[in-house]
């Protein structure tokens, strides 16, 4: 598979290979895989070990979130949450079957939510920055952070600059080895053009109105999908301001977060299962 070819190239080029891009994942993931090549492991096992480790981090983080804010039976609810996350079919297939790394960035997003509601915004945005350094999909959480800023005034707009700063910091080993600084930006810019299909096996808005396998619709709706998503998210911001929605409530925050992520998946182009 493509993961095996990435492994072979990274192992062959050693640490100096960080100066060149391998695959289409961001630099921090390439650094982790380089470190794994130093161990006597089969490539596929190594990828899956990394992902499975973060499955446990994700389960623990989610359990911590529930334990921190549950009003009763906290221990039981935390244990049930931990079990539900770790034994979820989505989590199991994603990591141990497909060797994907989604549990990495989602773990840090959960930790960010936990620390945000513990009134530790710097730590929260550091975790968001780490998540963003691993996966572009972290941007799905950004709108709800803007809502939180507007609603509560408990964070500063300056906190948002922590996100790109952490991305740069985590990519520094590759920059030191000679990687062009602009690569930090172009990696994600190129990802937005990956697939060139309006939707990829994702039952979203575009699956209802066009043939997802026809590349014509990708070019027809790509820019429209961005404007539509921004418009829908903007309407929600207006509602939050007009209705004076209090996002200090964790329950309200989580519901708004779920709606925000769902909106991005439903209306952005090239979403896949």
Protein language model features and the residues they cover:
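Transmembrane and membrane-interface helices of multi-pass
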Residues: 66-70, 78-91
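Extracytoplasmic catalytic/substrate-binding loops of multi-pass membrane glycan-assembly enzymes
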Residues: 1-8, 20-32, 45, 196-205
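Specific aromatic-rich, kink-prone transmembrane helix
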Residues: 61-64, 104-121
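Transmembrane helices and adjacent periplasmic/lumenal helix-loop junctions
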Residues: 103, 122, 126-148, 169, ...
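Aromatic/glycine/proline-enriched transmembrane-helix motif characteristic
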Residues: 56-59, 68, 191-270
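Perimembrane helix-loop-helix junctions
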Residues: 140-165, 176-177
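Short acidic/glycine- and proline-prone juxtamembrane loop motifs at membrane-interface regions
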Residues: 96-104
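Loop-to-helix entry region of an early transmembrane alpha helix in multi-pass inner-membrane enzymes
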Residues: 23, 27, 31, 41-60, ...
